[in-house]
Amino acid sequence: MSEAGGGKKPPVEPQAGPGPGRAAGERGLSGSFPLVLKKLMENPPRETRLDKEKGKEKLEEDESAAASTMAVSASLMPPIWDKTIPYDGESFHLEYMDLDEFLLENGIPASPTHLAQNLLLPVAELEGKESASSSTASPPSSSTAIFQPSETVSSTESSLEKERETPSPIDPNCVEVDVNFNPDPADLVLSSVPGGELFNPRKHKFAEEDLKPQPMIKKAKKVFVPDEQKDEKYWTRRKKNNVAAKRSRDARRLKENQITIRAAFLEKENTALRTEVAELRKEVGKCKTIVSKYETKYGPL
């Protein structure tokens, strides 16, 4: 007999049913899973062990660095940071704190005048001072870098006291006024004592007697002496009188010349001083107006 289509049908394989071998394999896998997990926990992979060792080393380094910084800061001053400020790059913000409360909490003395001037200080500034003092603790000159408000206050007070002190009186003889005075050299020679220093009209001083008016002296009447009585004694006395009269005339002329040149210089100096005083009065008037405006606006000084 021939089949339809002229082909042969493939043989049908028998389906494997749930036999006893497959069930035994599944039970073996489920039983070996706890053993594998236990081995992994006892002997972790190499990468996990390296990460744990690195974390432990980093933690030990941080602890040793913190202990060293605390030891350095303890050598300079008592520890003042009991709490650390977290810093993650975004949530860090500068905050202001009360300096008085901060000093009282940490037992640090401070000058009241300095506290009155600087009541609030930023935390970053205080932290910067602490880090600078701890980093420079090894050299002996680091103690001079610590801020000492008491010394600065005393120095400012001493400078203010020096400014308030009245200046010492000035000798009027040492004061020189710029005066365009150029006397004739011949007049200076005539006003100088022969054989002495050249007369200086700027610094020369006269005695009170020299500045007093001189009385007019009447000349004595001439007495006629005949030639028979003009003996040697007469001529000696007459020569002495002539020399004395010449000396008195020369001294009087010298004094008159000195007074004349000195008076000319004083007149020019007086004119220069008057102009200077006028300028000073203008400046003082301006200062007075400024002070009066300030007092009317803000009250008396």
Swiss-Prot record:
User: Region Leucine-zipper: start and end of each range?
Assistant: 254-261
List, for all copies, the residue spans of the domain called bZIP: 231-294
Annotated Basic and acidic residues bias: 39-59
> Where is this gene product found?
Nucleus
Regions annotated as coiled coil = none
Record InterPro entries = bZIP, bZIP_sf, PAR_bZIP
| Residue spans of biased composition, Low complexity class | 131-158
- Annotated function: Transcription factor that binds to and transactivates the TSHB promoter. Binds to a minimal DNA-binding sequence 5'-[TC][AG][AG]TTA[TC][AG]-3'.
The entry's protein name is: Thyrotroph embryonic factor
Q: Which organism is it from?
A: Rattus norvegicus
Q: Encoded by which gene? A: Tef
